[in-house]
Swiss-Prot record:
Name the record gives this protein: Ketol-acid reductoisomerase (NADP(+))
Residue positions binding substrate: S414
Binding site for Mg(2+) 2: D217, E389, E393
Requisite cofactors: Mg(2+)
Primary role: Involved in the biosynthesis of branched-chain amino acids (BCAA). Catalyzes an alkyl-migration followed by a ketol-acid reduction of (S)-2-acetolactate (S2AL) to yield (R)-2,3-dihydroxy-isovalerate. In the isomerase reaction, S2AL is rearranged via a Mg-dependent methyl migration to produce 3-hydroxy-3-methyl-2-ketobutyrate (HMKB). In the reductase reaction, this 2-ketoacid undergoes a metal-dependent reduction by NADPH to yield (R)-2,3-dihydroxy-isovalerate.
Record NCBIfam families: ilvC, PRK05225.1
Pfam families assigned: KARI_C (PF01450), KARI_N (PF07991)
Domain spans labelled KARI C-terminal knotted: 209-344, 345-485
Gene name of the record: ilvC
Gene Ontology CC: one annotated term: cytosol
Length: 492
């Protein structure tokens, strides 16, 4: 199999990278009706598999779970989750032949084996669904020509997909039809019905492509969503402790600071996040973010280039074939860091204190979000896609760190995201550890910025620069569809 993206000519590559249209709510008037009366079989019962299935069943669809025979015989976690929630569970041979739509929600590294196992069992004219297009785009999986291939990609972890649905809402979602596999022209109808069944149509749906989803998703998770948070956590904690800060306080400021800071980002973009700072602190955070962007732009561009070319996916798949040696080594190294093993702080940190004492963290968020967005857009990805894969998902990932530090983040995200996270963080930490971290001033981290003097013209110009960044323009529009988003509880 060959990387699908690399088989396309330049015009086709640009066309698929740039495929992105915000769909009107009227396009979902029929909601999930296209799939009602059809048999939907989900392969895999992890976070996405279980929670999408629960939503789809509550939307009136006929849902069952196909698991490997050994998972059923040994009553593994996937079998327990499906059966405890009252779903029909069977082997591939039991359920796949009758299915109208098979939804593959297993981890990326299992996709080829799963597809090769289920494809011979699929009836003529059935549909195959994904929530991430890595197997199609990067692996280049060949699907039978009578099979329709679609994607519905919620832009949240599976637990959030369920919680938002239970609130009567949903999470923003990308949908796509593989252009090589739409023999009956029904792919979009299937994808729309599936998205509606998960509740995604209530939060906004982007009609995208497999290519655009994969390339933007990989870029976001490697850089700002995971890699920047991991690098910032390790660098920030070590800096605080080296300057005499109580390790327990330093750990809490970092662990819960990302969540608190990005909650403002979620509600009002970079503008609101920066407005939570005093005027002197805002000017300092802006200056630090511009400095960070200058230092890190080549690293962001390298990650984007390696994603576009297939260099990243090739390296990761080689590690799959080598029993995940790199991934497991990096995971172990992260677990041994001082931040991961610091004592817990018993005291309370007020919400505003996270901003006042976390100016560097605010600067890192601003720099990372803008760089990821700018790099994706300059590579042909449309602004709406770039927004969802950078700013939108950041509070959700920060929330995982608040639960159990970096360990929890790396458990919750996919192995693909975790591998990319380590690649980025392992390069970003030494890049910033020397001159940049040494140049920090009192008030950048751990203490509030001293002084109250502000130049009016400078503040005016900085405010205009923040508010006029393209991600703020597109974000204002897209957040309008998400006014019912629940607030993530911030720690004290």
């Amino acid at each position: 199999m060959a990387n699908y993206f690399n088989t396309l000519n330049l015009r086709q590559q640009l066309d698929q990278l740039g495929k992105c249209r915000f769909m009107g709510r009227d396009e979902f008037a029929d909601e999930a009706s296209y799939l009602k009366g059809k048999k939907v079989v989900i392969v895999g019962c992890g976070a996405q598999g279980l929670n999408q299935g629960l939503n789809m069943r509550d939307s009136g669809l006929d849902i069952a779970y196909a698991l490997r025979a050994e998972a059923i015989a040994e009553k593994r976690a996937s079998w327990r989750k499906a059966t405890e929630n009252g779903f029909t569970v069977g082997t591939y041979e039991d359920l796949i032949p009758q299915a109208d739509l098979i939804v593959n929600l297993t981890p990326d590294k299992q996709h080829s084996a799963v597809v090769q196992a289920v494809q011979p069992l699929m009836k003529q004219g059935a549909a195959l669904g994904y929530s991430h297009g890595f197997n199609i785009v990067e692996v280049g999986e060949q699907i039978r020509k009578d099979i329709t291939v679609v994607m519905v990609a919620p832009k949240c972890p599976g637990t959030e997909v369920r919680e938002e649905y239970k609130r009567g809402f949903g999470v923003p979602t990308l949908i796509a039809v593989h252009p090589e596999n739409d023999p009956k022209g029904e792919g979009m109808a299937i994808a729309k019905a599936w998205a509606a069944a998960t509740g995604g149509h209530r939060a906004g749906v982007l009609q995208s492509s497999f290519v655009a989803e994969v390339k933007s998703d990989l870029m976001g998770e490697q850089t700002i969503l995971c890699g920047m948070l991991q690098a910032g956590s390790l660098l920030g904690f070590d800096k605080l402790v080296s300057e005499g800060t109580d390790p327990a306080y330093a750990e809490k400021l970092i662990q819960f600071g990302w969540e608190t800071i990005t909650e403002a980002l979620k509600q009002g973009g970079i503008t609101l996040m920066m407005d939570r700072l005093s005027n002197p602190a805002k000017l300092r955070a802006y200056a630090l973010s511009e400095q960070l962007k200058g230092i890190m732009a080549p690293l962001f561009q390298k990650h984007m280039d390696d994603i576009i070319s297939g260099e990243f996916s090739g390296g990761m798949m080689a590690d799959w074939a080598n029993d995940d040696v790199k991934l497991l080594t990096w995971r172990e190294e992260t677990g041994k860091t001082a931040f991961e093993n610091a004592p817990q702080f018993d005291g309370k940190i007020a919400e505003q204190e996270y901003f006042d004492n976390g100016v560097l963290m605010v600067a890192m968020v601003k720099a990372g979000v803008e760089l990821a967005f700018e790099t994706m857009v300059s590579s042909g990805i449309i602004e709406e896609s770039a927004y969802y894969e950078s700013l939108h998902e950041l509070p959700l990932i920060a929330n995982t760190i608040a639960r159990k530090r970096l360990y929890e983040m790396n458990v919750v995200i996919s192995d693909t995201a975790e591998y990319g996270n380590y690649l980025f963080a392992n390069a970003a930490v030494p890049l910033l550890k020397g001159a940049f971290m040494a140049s920090l001033q009192p008030g950048d981290l751990g203490k509030a910025v001293a002084g109250t003097e502000v130049d009016n013209a400078q503040l005016r110009d900085v405010n205009e620069a923040i508010r006029n960044h393209p991600i703020e323009t597109v974000g204002h529009t897209l957040r309008g569809y998400m006014k019912d988003m629940k607030r993530i509880a911030v720690a004290g």
